Amino acid sequence: MFGAVVVGAGPCGLAAAIALKKAGFSARVYDRDCVVASITRYPTYATFFSTAGKLSLGGLPFVVPVAKPSRRDALAYYRAVVTHFGLDVRQYEAVESITRAQGTFRVRTRRRGEEPREVRANAVVIATGYWGSPNRLLVPGEDLPHVTHAYGEGHHAFQQNVAVVGGGNSAAEAALELWRAGAKVTLIHFGPTFDKKIKPWILPDLENRIAEGSVDVRWNCRVTAIDHRVVHVRGALGDEHAIPADHVYLLTGYSPNVDLLRASGAAIDPETGIPKHNPATLETTVPGLYIAGVVVAGFDANKVFIENGRYHADRIVAGLMGRPAPDTPGVSRDLDG
């Protein structure tokens, strides 16, 4: 019997495991992928917007020789976190179901190619993030091999026609990197301009590339189908266009997957996607079932990051121990409108 099971080995899940262990709870972490799998999906040469101190966990210093760490730095740091704190992390073991009975939870898991297993726990923390659930366009051709919902690097697109779908930070950065790698870039967005939350140091650069004709842009257009060499789009007036594309990047964001929470009996707000919960403790409508990380923000994934999601663990532990919630930043009740 574990004191708690944590579902998700991202930074917020690891933070929860550390806090639980420090408080004397036995804890095991499960993830269907590797440790901090979400970060492995960042662009290969990505640099964080935050300083290293804001990404650190459990008081373990995140030391890098530059102001802001790279993707590679972060992967190395979070591996060190698991080792340093001796966390019990079961990678590549998916949680299939969570059932509450007689005051405890039965957690059913399965490793690839193996029979299911079951463990019991007094509490469960869901910290599954959202990178596994891209916002799909639901158009023909979306699953073709040259179409992806993630951007890695631009080298393979050298002298190729590429289409980038989206109007946020990921799409903007990818468009710039692909252009610098020698690709012929067309940016497609259903809106009339870029998203409001785009980073201020990215926007002028991309606007200049568009103004000089280096990057083509199609505003107010929606993708209707994807072929092997062409993306079909429809404009606001119903006009149809075929855009050459050897590679297609659908950078339209992600949404948290709440299927496991819903199947466990937790209530989910249908409009916001936020699991109903106590903002002081992050306990859901199922006693003993807690949430941490981006899932706390529902469909608005821009409200919870590593910087504030790592503090969710302190609220959860306080709730489990019957103590007043600590005054930590960035939890659900502090999310701006």
Show which residues each predicted segment covers:
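Beta1/beta-strand and adjacent pyrophosphate-binding region of the FAD-binding site
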Residues: 1-12, 159-168
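FAD-site-proximal beta/loop scaffold in flavoenzymes
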Residues: 142-156, 254-303
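Beta1-alpha1 glycine-rich phosphate/pyrophosphate-binding loop at the start
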Residues: 6-87, 172, 176-200, 270-271
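A Rossmann-like FAD-binding core segment of flavoenzymes
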Residues: 86, 90-121, 180-272, 324-336
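Predominantly flavin-linked oxidoreductase catalytic cores and closely associated redox partners
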Residues: 100-103, 114-187, 191-205
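A conserved FAD-binding loop/helix module that cradles the flavin
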Residues: 292-337
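Residues that mark the start of a beta-strand
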Residues: 3, 25-26, 160-162, 184, ...
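Short glycine-/acidic-enriched loop or helix-start segments at secondary-structure transitions
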Residues: 16, 39, 100, 135-137, ...
